[in-house]
Structures are given as structure tokens and as C-alpha cells.
């Protein structure tokens, strides 16, 4: 069994081929993180926790007169908020009375076969329930009664453990989620470096390596996308770890929105590491019976350096994240007209590029930006997803047919989330753009962003794309996104639901 639970149901050990992950629900229901690293078998590591009286670290009521028991110093699996742990929290809740506190205690745990799924978000999948198991830990908030479920997906052969969490409002009054991270853990007795991958436009994923110290190292994005500036992944590793030697802990967030990642030593030199949705401008109203899910974090451990860690991620993502026919097929070699023509093209230019590319063995022609609406530069036309037949005489079906006659596949460019102010769509529906009333919006590439939370926006886009893709033989879609999101506001969701 990849997941082992002690007879009293409070010591939980996760085993992969080469790693172990252990937690303990103590007598007060606090969920403690004991260990993550090389395999330990059935060893009980609860004796690793050494408590001491630390000044200015207070004590919960259950401690009584025991000043060595403090949420501020215990190595935890879920970081409480506002109740005595002065390190970074992982769950922050605001309540109708104006208070802001969260203190979750262990209730129960269970093991189920197969991988868990997350509504509306990507997660590793297991089609036959033979490759994975899931540990589900139920916790309850002491005052509000809110129910927290922690999910641990275990991929034994792949040396991967996934984490996510869900929060359910079990009370009558609304709860306001202000922070809800996917993963938090406190690692004892470690002296580690943090590796992150930063960058900018046209120069993404530049590796940076820095020691984890008492000064918090935090990176992330508030752009509405993970972005090329900061990749939603990090590696914690031994100070002297190399490609082929040393302990390495990988954390990869399966989420393309705003995110945060953090590592910091506390006063006892434990390292708190966290990852999840960025709490910047985040406030989610959870009404009675509603549940909120966090995105998935994919963890992997290697005791043989970065190379093994990389291969473990390659294998799990290829086999259990990728879908469709090209999961195991070679993808076609393509040519794109953008750098050759920019907006200045017609069907004859595209056919000529395709013909020359086909002679070189290139297998797909992708038609880029400029085929729709009044789109002769980047100042206009976005959102008007109707073929410009002044450029493409006979329309896309005819062009696609000619490309296929050359023995090539045909692909098409879209930027669905964007809108130009100089467009028929904006003139008809200015409220569909993300703008704040009374403020002139920020422009990037001369465009605004559509409010994709609106059903009418989604319905319009689906109707246009279904018509285009349904009437034209298209094997590939280039889905672009050329700006970040700001001026956060919705013209249909008010107050706490907007932003």
C-alpha cells in the first residue's frame, strides 16, 4: 500500500518507490508535518518533534500550563491564521462579525483508489485507478465549523505526490476566503537552496538559485496569468546539489492564473514552504453549503540530483496530464506566417509560404493574427471573429482546402480573451471589457481584456469559434494571450464578487 495509516488513525505515511511523506495528528488535532524525503519504510518519526519554551510564542487553550506547546513553533501541514502562529498562513478567513481567524483541527482520514479530480481545473488523471491512491484528511475549523479537506494523490512508481485542498461552509453565515493555498508544509532540520525560474518577454525560465534564510523568499504573479516573468514551479535542494547528486524537492503548480510561492526559515530554523493562488486582491464569498477548491500542486523528490527530478516530472506530465492523440504521437512540424508577413497578407501569400514550406518537409501551415475583422494592425479588430474576405478571398474553408491539397495540415490563430476598442464587438458591448467605472483603463498592445466570468461573453465566443472550426478543416489552434490583466472589475458582479 502506498498510503499507511496507524491503528489509531492519526499517523499517516505516504510511500513512493524512493520517497516517504509523514504526518501526525497530535492529541489536540493539530496536523503536524514530520518528514518528506528518502524512503523510511514503516518508521514512526514523531519523536523528531522537540518542543521547548520559546519566548513570545503563545500557547493555545489545549496546552494548559505547558508553554512548550505553541502553534508558532510546531511544524504544521496546514498553517492557521490569527490564532498564534505568526508565520505565513495558508488559509485566511474573514467572518461576518469582522474577525479574521482560522484554526483547523483533525477529524478523520480515509484512503480511496485512483486519482482525485478538481472541478474546472487540471489535475493528474488515472484512467484505470491502478496507478494511484488518494489520502483525504478531514479537518474542522474550531469556531465556524467550516470543513477543510486536504487531498494527497500518490503516484508510487512515478515518485510523485500531489496536493490540493477544498473548503466547505458548513454553517449558516457566509465565510470570506482571503487566502487559500494549495500546499503548505514545515520542513525540519534542513539547510536548503531555493531554485526559481524568472524571465521576461522573449527570455523566459532563467534559473535563479538562492539560499533559504530567515528573510522570506517569495515570488509569483498578480497578472492574471502565471506568465513568463515567474514560472509557477520551484525546487528546494541541498546546498551542494547538482544534476546527479543531492536531495531535491520539486513543487509545480498546475494553474495558469495569479500565483504565489514562498520559502522561509522560522526562529527554530524550520523551513515553511507554500504554493497556491496569489491572495493579492483575492476575496471569495463562500455561502452556506458551498465548496471552494484550490489548484493542484505536484510534488516530487529525488535523492539523485536535478536530472532524476526532471525525468520524474517529464514522465508524470506526459502520461497523466497530457491528453488526446498527440500524447504518444509525434506532433507535426509547422510554419507560421507571422514573422514573414505580420498583418500584410492575402491568400496568395499564405499559399506561397505553404508551398515552399511543404517542399522542405514542413507538415502544417498556421495562419496567424490578421485574418478577421478590420485587423490591419494591432489597434483594431480583436473580438470581431468574422473572416476578412478582402484578405482571404473565398474564406477560410477554401484556403484550408488549398493547404490540404499540398499535403499539409492547417492551423489558425485566436486570442479569445481580448477585445479592441476599435471593434464592432466593443461598440456593441463596451461593458464586456474589464474596466473600472470612472477610470481610463490601462492598455497593452492597444487592447483590453474580456470579462470571461460573464456567460454572455462565453456564449458569444463559443458560437463564433464553433462556426469557424465547424465549417473549416482545422487541425491546430494557436491560442494566444498578449497582455496581462489589470483594472479588475465586473459590470455584472458587484461588491465582494468583483475584483
PLM features: residue spans?
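Conserved, mostly hydrophobic/aromatic
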Residues: 18, 165, 289, 335, ...
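Catalytic domains of carbohydrate-active enzymes, especially glycoside hydrolases
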Residues: 349-372, 471
Amino acid at each position: 500500500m502506498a498510503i499507511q495509516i496507524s491503528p489509531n488513525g492519526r499517523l499517516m505515511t505516504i510511500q513512493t518507490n524512493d520517497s516517504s511523506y509523514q504526518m501526525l495528528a497530535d492529541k489536540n488535532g493539530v496536523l503536524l508535518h514530520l518528514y518528506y524525503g528518502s524512503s523510511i519504510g514503516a518508521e514512526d518519526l514523531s519523536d523528531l518533534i522537540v518542543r521547548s519554551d520559546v519566548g513570545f510564542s503563545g500557547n493555545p487553550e489545549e496546552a494548559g500550563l505547558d508553554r512548550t506547546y505553541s502553534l508558532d513553533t510546531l511544524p504544521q501541514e496546514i498553517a492557521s491564521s490569527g490564532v498564534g502562529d505568526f508565520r505565513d498562513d495558508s488559509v485566511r478567513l474573514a467572518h461576518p462579525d469582522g474577525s479574521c481567524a482560522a484554526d483547523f483541527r483533525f477529524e478523520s482520514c480515509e484512503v480511496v483508489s485512483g486519482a482525485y479530480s478538481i472541478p474546472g481545473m487540471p489535475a493528474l488523471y488515472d484512467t484505470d485507478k491502478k496507478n494511484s491512491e488518494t489520502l483525504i484528511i478531514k479537518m474542522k475549523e474550531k469556531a465556524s465549523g467550516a470543513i477543510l479537506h486536504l487531498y494527497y494523490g500518490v503516484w508510487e512508481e512515478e515518485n510523485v505526490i500531489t496536493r490540493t485542498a477544498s473548503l466547505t461552509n458548513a454553517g449558516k453565515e457566509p465565510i470570506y476566503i482571503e487566502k487559500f493555498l494549495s500546499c503548505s508544509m514545515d520542513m525540519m532540520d534542513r539547510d536548503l537552496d531555493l531554485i526559481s525560474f524568472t524571465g521576461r518577454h522573449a527570455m523566459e525560465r532563467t534559473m535563479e538559485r538562492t539560499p533559504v534564510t530567515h528573510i522570506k523568499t517569495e515570488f509569483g504573479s498578480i497578472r492574471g496569468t502565471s506568465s513568463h516573468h515567474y514560472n509557477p514551479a520551484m525546487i528546494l535542494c541541498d546546498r551542494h546539489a547538482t544534476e546527479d547528486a543531492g536531495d531535491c524537492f520539486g513543487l509545480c503548480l498546475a494553474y495558469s492564473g495569479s500565483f504565489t510561492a514562498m520559502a522561509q526559515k522560522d526562529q527554530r530554523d524550520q523551513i515553511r514552504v507554500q504554493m497556491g493562488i496569489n491572495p493579492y486582491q483575492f476575496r471569495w464569498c463562500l455561502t452556506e453549503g458551498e465548496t471552494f477548491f484550490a489548484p493542484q500542486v505536484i510534488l516530487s523528490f529525488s535523492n539523485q540530483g536535478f536530472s532524476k527530478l526532471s525525468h520524474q516530472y517529464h514522465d508524470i506530465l506526459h502520461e497523466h496530464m497530457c491528453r488526446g492523440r498527440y500524447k504518444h504521437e509525434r506532433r507535426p512540424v509547422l510554419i507560421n506566417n507571422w514573422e514573414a508577413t505580420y498583418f500584410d497578407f492575402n491568400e496568395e501569400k499564405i499559399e506561397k509560404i505553404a508551398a515552399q514550406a511543404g517542399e522542405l518537409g514542413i507538415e502544417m501551415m498556421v495562419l496567424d493574427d490578421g485574418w478577421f475583422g478590420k485587423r490591419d494592425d494591432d489597434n483594431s479588430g480583436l473580438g470581431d471573429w468574422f473572416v476578412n474576405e478582402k484578405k482571404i478571398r473565398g474564406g477560410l474553408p477554401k484556403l484550408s482546402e488549398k493547404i490540404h491539397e499540398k499535403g499539409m495540415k492547417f492551423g489558425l490563430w485566436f486570442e479569445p480573451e481580448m477585445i479592441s476598442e476599435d471593434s464592432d464587438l466593443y461598440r456593441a458591448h463596451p461593458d464586456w471589457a474589464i474596466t473600472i467605472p470612472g477610470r481610463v483603463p490601462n492598455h497593452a498592445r492597444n487592447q483590453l481584456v474580456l470579462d470571461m466570468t460573464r456567460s454572455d461573453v462565453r456564449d458569444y465566443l463559443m458560437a463564433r469559434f464553433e462556426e469557424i472550426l465547424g465549417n473549416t478543416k482545422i487541425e491546430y489552434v494557436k491560442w494566444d494571450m498578449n497582455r496581462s490583466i489589470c483594472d479588475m472589475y465586473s459590470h455584472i458582479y458587484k461588491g465582494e464578487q468583483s475584483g
